[in-house]
């Protein structure tokens, strides 16, 4: 068995016949919960002694294209006016001018009737600004102002117990699905909830998030959640991935979980495309869990017992949620390929 060291220690699989406590066991223990211009001047650095020392034309960066000037053409502060303030203003007016009570009562009746009937002719076109405004007003009134203790603590800092990788799909917000409260989870959302392997250059954004969550926030759990009818996984299963990309970013991104596609094709090659996608949605989660092991600080947390990895799957069609975990241990010999074998996908 070929082995490859991973930052001073190794990973290996545990065969059925082996029971040594020194061996690593990394397996999915199914626990199901059902809920219905760089410059090239260096190459020509030799200069004549008669030349004058070059100077900058201006002491600021020069770009190939001017930076865009971005200025908001409107701005509105939200949450400063609310229903209660309007009611108080009306009460004050009626106290000062009692003769308006009859007129006010009639107006209130008209407003009430209009709100109750709500005919289709009264419906307005979708207003994105008003939707955001009303959404914040509702949040502030029903949640922020009713829980000052929670938001008071959050003003001091955050200490989430979870780091969650979830899909950007608008139907699967993890805070709604799992009823997370503000401060509970440090969330990263992207296409198909994928975690790329450790790479300081190519995937720095994801790496920075994992590093911050593990080393600074001290999260205790990293959860990767897949979901039903995932467009990213459908793309992974559909794209030829032969180097002739038809997209600027998507195909290169979903290649992260190409091992999951390979496994599904080898095992379900004759099955319907929808069934293949459903299987790949779960297998891609396992690929991401394995990729998390390539981050040194994640492995360190697993060894110390301060961090746990979990996989999840949300079926919003059936209203069900699956959760599984990974067990981790130390071994004297291991290889990256062994990790792949344990998770049942091919490198």
Swiss-Prot record:
**Residues modified as Phosphoserine:** 175, 266
As stated in the Swiss-Prot or TrEMBL entry, residues carrying the post-translational modification Phosphotyrosine are 203
Q: In which tissues is it expressed?
A: Strongly expressed in aerial tissues including leaves, stems, flowers and siliques. Accumulates in both guard cells and mesophyll cells.
Reaction(s) the record says it catalyses: hydrogencarbonate + H(+) = CO2 + H2O
Explain what the UniProt record notes about the effect of disrupting the gene for this protein. Reduced levels of seedling establishment associated with altered cotyledon photosynthetic performance at the onset of phototrophic growth and prior to the development of true leaves. These phenotypes are reversed in high CO(2) or sucrose supplemented conditions. Decreased resistance against avirulent bacteria. In plants lacking both BCA1 and BCA4, impaired CO(2)-regulation of stomatal movements associated with reduced beta carbonic anhydrase activity in guard cells, and increased stomatal density.
Report what the Swiss-Prot or TrEMBL entry states about this protein's PTMs: S-nitrosylation at Cys-280 is up-regulated during nitrosative burst and suppresses both binding of salicylic acid and carbonic anhydrase activity. S-nitrosylated in response to an avirulent but not to a virulent bacterial strain.
**Assembly and interaction partners:** Homohexamer.
| GO cellular component terms attached to this protein's record | apoplast; chloroplast; chloroplast envelope; chloroplast stroma; chloroplast thylakoid membrane; cytosol; plasma membrane; stromule
Q: Which InterPro entries match?
A: Beta_CA_cladeB (IPR045066), Carbonic_anhydrase (IPR001765), Carbonic_anhydrase_CS (IPR015892), Carbonic_anhydrase_sf (IPR036874)
What stretch of residues directs this protein to its organelle as a transit peptide? 1-113
Q: What is this protein called?
A: Beta carbonic anhydrase 1, chloroplastic
Q: Is the keyword Chloroplast assigned to this protein?
A: yes
PROSITE patterns per the UniProt record, alphabetical: PROK_CO2_ANHYDRASE_1, PROK_CO2_ANHYDRASE_2
What's the reported outcome of changing residue 280 to S? Loss of nitrosylation and decreased carbonic anhydrase activity, but no effect on salicylic acid binding
Gene name per UniProt: BCA1
Return the EC number. Answer: 4.2.1.1
Ranked from the top, the taxonomy reads: Eukaryota, Viridiplantae, Streptophyta, Embryophyta, Tracheophyta
């Amino acid at each position: 068995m070929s082995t490859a060291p991973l930052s001073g220690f190794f990973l290996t699989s545990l065969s059925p016949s082996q029971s040594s406590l020194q061996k690593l066991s990394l397996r999915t223990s199914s626990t199901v919960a059902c809920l219905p211009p760089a410059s090239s001047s260096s190459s020509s650095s030799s200069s004549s002694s008669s030349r004058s020392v070059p100077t900058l034309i201006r002491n600021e960066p020069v770009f190939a294209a001017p930076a865009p000037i971005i200025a908001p053409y409107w701005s509105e502060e939200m949450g400063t006016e609310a229903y209660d303030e309007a009611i108080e203003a009306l009460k004050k007016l009626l106290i000062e001018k009692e003769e308006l009570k009859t007129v006010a009562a009639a107006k209130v009746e008209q407003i009430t009737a209009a709100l109750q009937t709500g005919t289709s002719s009264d419906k307005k076109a979708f207003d994105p600004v008003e939707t955001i405004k009303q959404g914040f007003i509702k949040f502030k009134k029903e949640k922020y102002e009713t829980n000052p203790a929670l938001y008071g603590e959050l003003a001091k800092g955050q200490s989430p117990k979870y780091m969650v990788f979830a899909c950007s799909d608008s139907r699967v917000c993890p805070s709604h699905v799992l009823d997370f409260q503000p401060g509970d989870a440090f969330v990263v959302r992207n296409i198909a909830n994928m975690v790329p392997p450790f790479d300081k250059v190519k995937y720095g954004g994801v790496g920075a998030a994992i590093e911050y969550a593990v080393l600074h926030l001290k999260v205790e759990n990293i959860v990767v959640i897949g979901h039903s009818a995932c467009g990213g996984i459908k793309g992974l299963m559909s794209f030829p991935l032969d180097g002739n990309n038809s997209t600027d970013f998507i195909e290169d991104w979903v290649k992260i979980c190409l091992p999951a596609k390979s496994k599904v094709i080898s095992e379900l090659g004759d099955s319907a495309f929808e069934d293949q996608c459903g299987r790949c949605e779960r297998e891609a989660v396992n690929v991401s869990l394995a990729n998390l092991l390539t981050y040194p600080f994640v492995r360190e947390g697993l060894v110390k017992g301060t961090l746990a990895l979990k996989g999840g799957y949300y079926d919003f069609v059936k209203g069900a949620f699956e959760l599984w975990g990974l067990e981790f241990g130390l071994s004297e010999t291991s290889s990256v390929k062994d990790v792949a074998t344990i998770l049942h996908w091919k490198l």
